[in-house]
Design a protein with these regions (language model features):
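Conserved catalytic cores of very large enzyme subunits
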Residues: 1-27, 56, 60-63, 67-74, ...
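Extended non-globular scaffold/tether segments
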Residues: 28-36
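Heptad-repeat amphipathic alpha-helical coiled-coil interaction surface used
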Residues: 35, 42, 46-49, 58, ...
């Protein structure tokens, strides 16, 4: 959706539920606040780029400004934009209610990575760097691996890249490997290796079958 899409969705449901106008007013204030926050970052990146003498650093500042301009209203279209969008959401949600729950990191970001690779917009090393930057931004809880609703494995090359990004960061992360009975033992061993190598308490491990049964007990369909 992007921030602009969220505003459109709020406007749509405001018309359907005018009795909840106060609620929608509050939601719109939050989104506009985040957009204002992003706008300041764009302005500061451009200001720093004007005085930066190192060409690589100047180019990165200009890219930061453009990435944030792209997601100010629109939905993310590249992996870098997706990571940047999540960074803003993480910071805003922490401020709002100390939220720490993330998502299935490998599955969500993989679609952007695959599209970028197809178009030649990114390299594997750049993607790992973006993952490390995202993990540095905030220790939100993320899952990797496990199975989908049909019991098929979600593990992919990108799952390995998440571990590599966390390894390069070499700091506290909140990554959990979903362990199912058919998990690729090579991946599981690699995850355990990182746990002992870095001694930073990651990754954690969660039994996928018990997790899924718990969700079903709460009313989620099989």
């Amino acid at each position: 959706l992007g921030w602009g899409g969220i505003l459109e969705k709020l406007a749509f449901y405001r018309k359907k539920h005018p009795e909840h106008a106060e609620f929608y007013d509050a939601e719109e204030l939050v989104v506009h606040g985040v957009q204002n926050w992003i706008s300041h970052a764009i302005e500061e990146s451009e200001r720093l780029a004007r005085v930066e003498r190192h060409p690589v650093l100047r180019e990165n500042l200009l890219q930061i400004a453009q990435v944030n301009r792209n997601i100010l209203n629109g939905a993310p279209k590249t992996m870098r934009e997706a990571c940047q969008w999540v960074c803003w959401f993480n910071m805003a949600s922490r401020t709002y209610n100390r939220d720490g729950a993330g998502f299935q990191l490998d599955e969500v970001l993989k679609q952007y990575y695959d599209a970028d690779m197809k178009e030649g917009r990114i390299t594997r090393d750049e993607a790992i760097f973006y993952i490390a930057c995202l993990l540095l931004n905030d220790p939100h809880y993320y899952q990797i691996g496990g199975t989908n609703e049909n019991g098929d494995p979600l593990l992919s090359e990108f799952s390995y890249m998440v571990l590599e990004g966390a390894d390069k960061l070499d700091s506290a992360c909140n990554i959990t490997v979903r362990v199912d009975e058919n998990i690729d033992r090579k991946f599981l061993n690699k995850a355990v290796d990182y746990l002992f190598k870095n001694k930073n308490g990651w990754p954690r491990f969660s039994g996928d079958e018990a997790l899924n049964r718990g969700f079903m007990r709460l009313g989620y369909p099989e």
